[in-house]
């Protein structure tokens, strides 16, 4: 197939074209990004250095924090730098790389959240066999499945996009490169391809969301004969995960489970699931988890002690 395109770069509209608001955007998203990096890396360091946090749940949480770090980094730095640029330019290859990064890390996180729900199910419904079932080798395999799934999803999406004829215009009505805004710039009819993107992206969101719902329905049914105290204790194990699932899945389903249409609210939704959710994940897991908070305090005391020495 011959690659036909005249466009070598794209111009991003950004979040706002108001100079004052662009300065506000710079400050706000720089702070958000710094909190995201520090929070997620703190989780990674805390779990990897603490012997008390060696269960499969924390193994998965480490990988979730790593994914959140790189996922946010696929769009936040460009948005921050562009806040001071009158003309927000991104090369064709850079645009495709950004779209690819967004989809590989986003899809991997979706699958990993589903894996974490299955871990939660085993912990609550089969506690006596938990360590036997959730062996370290199985945990590694499940994380590998998440990454392979994300890789296949993103690769299929981008291979269909990179060969499309972009003849102009080259102005993307977004602050980052994403498939739906890009498809609006293609010189041919993209209705069929748009349906494929919706099916591919929407399917991975919806399928994993349904698996999550089924997992929690089974968990709730298994707890119906337990005491109220027992139910509360069991559910507290997974409530943080439920919050993260809702925060991440609802915006993704809203954006991708529809035809090739872009709405004014899409940019705000994209900010939420690419920057706000990765920032909130460490907060959600830390505030509701006494073991993580205790490990962070021990890590901090160890650092203070070493500094004093």
Swiss-Prot record:
Pfam families, sorted: 7tm_4
Superkingdom of the organism of origin: Eukaryota
Primary localization: membrane
InterPro entries: GPCR_Rhodpsn, GPCR_Rhodpsn_7TM, Olfact_rcpt, Olfactory_Receptors
Localisation: Cell membrane
Residues passing through the membrane, by range: 24-47, 56-77, 99-118, 138-156, 194-217, 234-256, 268-287
Alphabetized UniProt keyword annotations: Cell membrane, Disulfide bond, G-protein coupled receptor, Glycoprotein, Membrane, Olfaction, Receptor, Sensory transduction, Transducer, Transmembrane, Transmembrane helix
Sequence ranges on the Cytoplasmic membrane side: 48-55, 119-137, 218-233, 288-309
Annotated S-S bridges: 95-187
Extracellular topological intervals: 1-23, 78-98, 157-193, 257-267
GO molecular function: G protein-coupled receptor activity; olfactory receptor activity
Membrane topology reported for the UniProt record: Multi-pass membrane protein
A cellular-component GO term for this protein: plasma membrane
Glycosylation sites: 6
Task of the protein: Odorant receptor.
Family under the similarity heading: Belongs to the G-protein coupled receptor 1 family.
Name used for this protein in its record: Olfactory receptor 4C12
Species whose genome carries this gene: Homo sapiens
């Amino acid at each position: 197939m011959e690659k036909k395109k005249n466009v070598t770069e794209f111009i991003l509209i950004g979040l706002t074209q108001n100079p004052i608001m662009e300065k506000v955007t710079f400050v706000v998203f720089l702070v958000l990004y710094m909190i995201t990096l520090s929070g997620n890396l703190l989780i990674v360091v805390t779990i990897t250095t603490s012997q008390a946090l060696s269960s499969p749940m924390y193994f998965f949480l480490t990988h979730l924090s790593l994914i959140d770090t790189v996922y946010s980094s696929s769009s936040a730095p460009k948005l921050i730098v562009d806040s001071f640029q009158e003309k927000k330019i991104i090369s064709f290859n850079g645009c495709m790389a950004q779209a690819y990064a967004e989809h590989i890390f986003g899809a991997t996180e979706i699958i990993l959240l589903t894996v974490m729900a299955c871990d939660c199910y085993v912990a609550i419904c089969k506690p006596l066999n938990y360590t036997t079932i959730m062996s370290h080798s199985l945990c590694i395999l499940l994380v590998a499945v998440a990454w392979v799934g994300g890789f296949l999803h993103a690769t299929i999406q981008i291979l269909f996009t990179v060969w499309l004829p972009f003849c102009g215009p080259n102005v993307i009505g977004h602050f980052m490169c994403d498939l739906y805004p890009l498809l609006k710039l293609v010189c041919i009819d993209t209705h069929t391809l748009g349906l494929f993107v919706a099916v591919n992206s929407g399917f991975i969101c919806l399928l994993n969301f349904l698996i999550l719902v089924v997992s929690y329905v089974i968990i709730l049914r298994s707890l119906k004969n337990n005491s109220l105290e027992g139910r509360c204790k069991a559910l507290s194990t997974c409530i943080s995960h439920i919050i993260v699932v809702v925060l991440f899945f609802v915006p993704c389903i809203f954006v991708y489970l529809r035809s090739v249409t872009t709405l004014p609210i899409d940019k705000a939704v994209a900010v939420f699931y690419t920057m706000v959710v990765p920032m909130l994940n460490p907060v959600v897991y830390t505030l509701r988890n006494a073991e993580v908070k205790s490990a962070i305090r021990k890590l901090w005391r160890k650092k203070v002690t070493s500094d004093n020495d």
